[in-house]
């Protein structure tokens, strides 16, 4: 028995996340299962404005941006698991623990982001996240996000 993969294109992603260029870190979602896991992609391009300063002679995608991409992936999984946001509601990145950076990410790399839902309590959801390039883990972390009105 084969199960069809659930995907999200950029239009569907923008309907769920409030982020826009240059801060939208998810290019597409290739699979997700509500309440369980989500796989997303971030294509790292030299054309991103952050590379003018990080670092001019050796461009490296900042670790905090990898974590932001993971956080956006958790927001997408949370919305798909617990319902789409109302007009004045979103998931805020609440905390990060056990973050580890294992290898630099450079222009031309494709980040494969995997997030796994662990538990939810009082509107705060806990996730495990990993980012891989060419099958190698470049970053891992535990992330929490909180659903709140703004």
UniProtKB/Swiss-Prot annotation:
Per UniProt, subcellular location reads as: Cytoplasm
Q: Which residue windows are coiled coil?
A: none
Q: What is its main location?
A: cytoplasm
Disulphides? none
InterPro entries per UniProt: FabA_FabZ, FabZ, HotDog_dom_sf
Where does the record place the catalytic residues? 54
- The keyword Plastid is assigned to this record: no
Q: What class of enzyme is it?
A: lyase
Keywords, ordered alphabetically = Cytoplasm, Lipid A biosynthesis, Lipid biosynthesis, Lipid metabolism, Lyase
Name the family the entry cites.
Belongs to the thioester dehydratase family. FabZ subfamily.
Q: Mind telling me what this protein is named?
A: 3-hydroxyacyl-[acyl-carrier-protein] dehydratase FabZ
Give the organism, scientific name: Photobacterium profundum (strain SS9)
